[in-house]
Amino acid sequence: IAETISIPRLEDMQDRIYIPKPLSERMQVAEQEMAGENRLVTALFADISGFTPLSRQYSSERVVEIVNACFKSVVDVVLNYEGNINRFIGDCVLAFFGAPITHENDPERSILAALDIQTEVKKLSLSLKVGINSGMMYFGPIGTPKHQEISAYGPDINMAKRLQEAAKPG
């Protein structure tokens, strides 16, 4: 007993959706920048410290609750500094500053975000290891026609991850 439903396409709904002008302008800039290019990007990796013992101590459901609470704090702070959450990788968050929207002080924004993230996560009795690096990276679509992601690639993003791995918690 299947029924076919019609879902309206976003393009068909644009006449009926109100988008504030500042957001519309940012969306247009971001769309133009999504073609893929080498650009200055600041990558921030934030990884929960002591996650393996934590995951052994609690049920899977409780671990997911803890991780989600941590991720909420990270996401809220990154967005507050106008960064972009790229993805969650296990117990790690990858965020970009300067992609797709660029600010002249993106590296500073990422550092301020990292400090605020540490403060917020301490309230949850957790600590993070954070790594940040800025450099020229490819930012744009990666993948195949059947599955694409928008991400950044290059040695400078790998350095951010290595710095995160070497960092002390908190």
Question: Which residues fall in each region the model found?
Answer:
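Regulatory cytosolic signal-relay segments
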Residues: 1-39
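Leucine-rich amphipathic alpha-helices with coiled-coil/heptad-repeat character
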Residues: 5, 55-58, 121
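Generic structural marker for isolated residues within well-ordered, non-membrane alpha-helices
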Residues: 12, 51, 160
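Glycine-centered helix-coil hinge/cap
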Residues: 20-21, 59, 154
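Alpha-helix/helix-capping structural signal
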Residues: 22, 49, 136-137
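Amphipathic alpha-helical regulatory segments at dimerization interfaces
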Residues: 26, 30-33, 73-80, 116-123, ...
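Catalytic NTP-binding/metal-coordinating core of nucleotidyl cyclase/transferase enzymes
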Residues: 30-113, 150
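Catalytic beta-strand-to-alpha-helix segment of the class III nucleotidyl cyclase homology domain
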Residues: 96-170
